[in-house]
Design a protein with these regions (language model features):
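Helix-loop "lid/cap" segments that line or gate small-molecule binding pockets
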Residues: 62-69, 77-83, 162-167
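Short, hydrophobic secondary-structure boundary micro-motifs
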Residues: 76-79, 91, 119, 176
Length: 192
């Protein structure tokens, strides 16, 4: 992500961007504050008795997609700029703790309503693996020099489904896979 691209996204000149932020570090801190705020909003999503758990999980995946697309360079390029900004470092443990609780709540609810056949004592393992695939998928693509295009985020969702879709009710698995495929189709249309 270049400052020229950021300025274009905001509809301002690059010079105006630098007038406001002065340095790349100031710009990174501002983006990081917004990232932490957005992440905390996404982390508020939980299964609800008013919503089908699969619909809730699809909503969670869509929120993750928005987060990864908006802040993809924080995930993908951290090695290039020397690590996270201080606000992310100050919040990272809490963000991971909340992410584990969030995924655990969804997987536990899927088990409770009979959609996921998974041993209770292994839900934490599934939770951590799902987070690892979603969180580090972009970095993996970058480090292995695979194509990184607009469908990369959605591809990470398809990969994370392979962790548990074989233990899902077939109709629920199809709904999740179809939702991920729609994300891929929408992503390809945006890129065209």
């Amino acid at each position: 992500v270049t400052t020229a691209a950021l300025a274009a996204e905001l509809g301002i000149s690059e010079g105006n961007l630098w007038y406001h932020f002065k340095t790349k570090r100031h710009l990174l801190e501002s983006i990081s504050e917004e990232f932490v705020r957005y992440s905390n909003e996404r982390l508020a999503l939980r299964p609800s008795s008013e919503t089908d758990v699969i619909e809730g999980y699809i909503e969670l995946m869509m929120a993750h997609e928005r987060e990864l697309l908006l802040y993809r360079f924080l995930y993908r390029d951290q090695a290039d700029y020397g690590g996270h900004s201080q606000i992310v470092l100050d919040n990272i443990t809490g963000l991971y703790d909340k992410s584990r609780a969030q995924f655990r709540a969804f997987f536990t609810e899927m088990v409770r309503v009979g959609l996921l056949d998974w041993p209770e004592d292994r839900i934490d393992h599934l939770t951590v693996n799902a987070i690892i695939l979603i969180r580090f998928g972009l970095e993996y693509l970058r480090e292995t020099q695979q194509a990184f295009d607009s469908s990369a985020v959605e591809q990470t969702f398809l990969q994370h489904l392979t962790l548990f879709e074989h233990q899902l009710d077939p109709a629920a698995a199809k709904r999740l896979r179809d939702a991920a495929a729609r994300l891929l189709t929408d992503s390809a249309a945006r890129a065209a």
